[in-house]
């Protein structure tokens, strides 16, 4: 996949990589989680066949996208020790997409669900009391988005510093 190669090439230049995205950007943060040390995804669309918000693509393409995303998450957690944090509102469609990830990992026998905040090799779902797909905007308006992003960045900076001292 040409995007994966491009992302891998850029990521090689950094001690730590954090992928961050909202909606389909969150989907990309998960799709390429295996070339990151952490992924922070707000309302990702994982299974486009069941998502209420989806592109005009074939069912076969959507199944390949779902499988590629879940495969990347598994590689990220098992091989890289990536910390994946998925944020969702309470809107049932977004929550179903978010909860699909830990359920799929459990079904695959990948023991990574829950864990401490920012724990390596983990998938964590955080639900917020926002009942629509515009979660990142709602968090920003409530002054809650920046602390979430700042925490994720600080964790990666601390890991990079620890590795340099190591």
List the predicted regions and their residue ranges.
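Alpha/beta-hydrolase active-site loop
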Residues: 1-12
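Conserved alpha/beta-hydrolase fold motif
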Residues: 17-19
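Gly/Ala-rich beta-loop-alpha elbow adjacent to hydrolase catalytic centers
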Residues: 21-25, 29
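A short acidic, amphipathic alpha-helical/loop segment
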Residues: 28-32, 100-101
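Conserved hydrolase catalytic core segment
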Residues: 31-40
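Active-site nucleophile loop of the alpha/beta-hydrolase fold
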Residues: 41-52, 90
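The feature captures the conserved acid-bearing segment of alpha/beta-hydrolase catalytic domains
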Residues: 52-138, 142-164
């Amino acid at each position: 996949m040409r995007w994966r190669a491009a992302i891998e090439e850029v990521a090689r230049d950094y001690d730590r990589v954090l992928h961050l995205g909202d909606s389909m950007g969150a989907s990309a943060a998960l799709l390429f989680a295996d070339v990151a040390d952490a992924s922070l995804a707000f309302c990702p669309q994982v299974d486009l066949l069941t998502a209420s918000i989806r592109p005009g693509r074939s069912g076969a393409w959507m199944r390949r996208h779902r499988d590629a995303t879940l495969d990347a998450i598994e590689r990220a957690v098992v091989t890289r020790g990536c910390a994946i944090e998925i944020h969702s509102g309470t809107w049932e469609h977004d929550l179903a997409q978010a909860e699909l990830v830990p359920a799929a990992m459990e079904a695959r026998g990948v023991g990574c669900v829950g864990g401490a905040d920012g724990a390596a090799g983990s998938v964590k779902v955080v639900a917020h009391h926002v009942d629509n797909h515009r979660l990142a905007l709602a968090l920003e308006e409530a002054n809650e988005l920046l602390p979430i992003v700042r925490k994720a960045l600080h964790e990666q900076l601390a890991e990079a510093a620890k590795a340099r001292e190591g």
